[in-house]
């Protein structure tokens, strides 16, 4: 009997489109002899959809059209049976799809940072990949740096500044110039990959 895998991709993230590509590439690479793959698309509102076209990359050229011919679902645990249930629930609606495990192929905040993993864990759904804590740590660049450094892994020096700290921007720049120097890499603490990264070569 094949393992039924709900491959989840997309989601409420600035890396939404990259996640769609990653998810479909993962689906295409999975052994169809071992796995019954159920593609699950998460919209930019984190709504879940399944359907015949969900696993086809060309369908994402027209997302409203794709959703109109797909079925919105919710992922639930019914007496230890994991199902993708059509939403809204109707007495004589479409049947639920039973799955064995979820496989999140997601990038960025709101999905890769432990949020989706926490949701899956809360409702008791087995999933592939990092747990909540490691997902959250991996997404927070400064927290990752601190944990690595505390465990003897060589890392470059860095500082984390919040939005409120920018009221003292001159003090921040003084600290950067004194303790790090230029060029300095400036990046959001919790966006994925290289999103938002820039290089500061001087004070201005």
Label each PLM-derived region with a short phrase.
Residues 1-133, 137-139, 143, 150, ...:
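ATP-binding N-terminal substructure of ATP-dependent carboxylate-amine bond-forming enzymes
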Residues 97, 153, 180:
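Structured loop/turn residues at beta-strand edges in well-structured enzyme cores
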Residues 106-109, 159, 189, 203:
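Anionic group-transfer/hydrolysis microenvironments
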Residues 147-155:
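Basic phosphate/pyrophosphate-binding loop/patch that engages nucleotide-derived ligands
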Residues 148-149, 176-197:
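ATP-grasp fold ATP-binding core
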Residues 198-204:
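Conserved ATP-binding module of the ATP-grasp superfamily
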């Amino acid at each position: 009997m094949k393992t039924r895998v709900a491959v989840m991709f997309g989601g409420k993230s600035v890396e939404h489109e990259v996640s769609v590509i990653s998810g479909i590439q993962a689906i295409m690479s999975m052994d169809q002899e071992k796995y019954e793959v159920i593609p699950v698309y998460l919209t930019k509102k984190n709504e879940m959809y399944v359907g015949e076209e969900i696993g086809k990359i060309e369908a994402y050229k027209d997302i409203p059209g794709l959703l109109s011919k797909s079925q919105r679902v919710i992922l639930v645990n019914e007496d230890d049976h994991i199902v993708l249930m059509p939403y809204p629930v109707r007495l004589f609606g479409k049947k639920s799809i039973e799955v064995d495990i979820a496989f999140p192929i997601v990038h960025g905040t709101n999905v890769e940072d432990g949020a989706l993993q926490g949701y899956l864990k809360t409702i008791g759904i087995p999933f592939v990949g990092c747990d909540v804590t490691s997902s959250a740590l991996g997404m927070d660049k400064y927290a990752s740096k601190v944990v690595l450094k505390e465990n003897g892994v060589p890392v470059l020096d860095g500082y984390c500044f919040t939005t409120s700290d920018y009221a003292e921007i001159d003090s921040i720049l003084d600290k950067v110039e004194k303790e790090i120097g230029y060029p300095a890499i400036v990046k959001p603490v919790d966006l994925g990959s290289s999103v938002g990264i820039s290089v500061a070569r001087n004070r201005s």
